[in-house]
């Protein structure tokens, strides 16, 4: 297991209690036997980059699963739904960590990171489904999917009687 994967795995034990913060980052580095300096080399912004890498790894896993289970006979909307459900199922494995990540990403200073994360996920989904559009549709597909994904995540991670 790489240092990056080890830090993510260890931090997931602490995030539900402490959130994605300096304390979690320091505890993860200490438990992994990595100095804070080495940790900062891997994640220059500390817990923020650790959180974004955690999300990115789940996004990459979702793309692998979607590509491997691709059913070209389905309509695009069904394939998009499958991709979204796959991503939500992956988030379910660490729901509280995802909830804490979304809380952090909703802060004003995190808007650029949040926008990039949502855009990259939308782009990855459309690319994994073989989107070949080159006109304005390229943008509208990604913006629309990003909006749907963001709304779905907010609903999914919000506290409710279902929990």
Explain the meaning of each model-derived region.
Residues 2, 100, 104-117:
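Domain-scale activation on soluble regions of proteins
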Residues 2-37, 45-52:
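Short, amphipathic alpha-helix enriched in basic
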Residues 8, 48, 81-88, 119-126:
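Hydrophobic core segments within long, regular secondary-structure runs in both alpha-
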Residues 55-61:
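Short, basic, alpha-helical segments at the C-terminal edge of helix-turn-helix-like DNA-binding modules
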Residues 65-100:
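Hydrophobic alpha-helical connector segments
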Residues 109-131, 141-150:
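Amphipathic alpha-helical packing segments from all-alpha helical-bundle domains
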Residues 156-163:
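Conserved small/polar residues in nucleotide/adenosyl-binding loops
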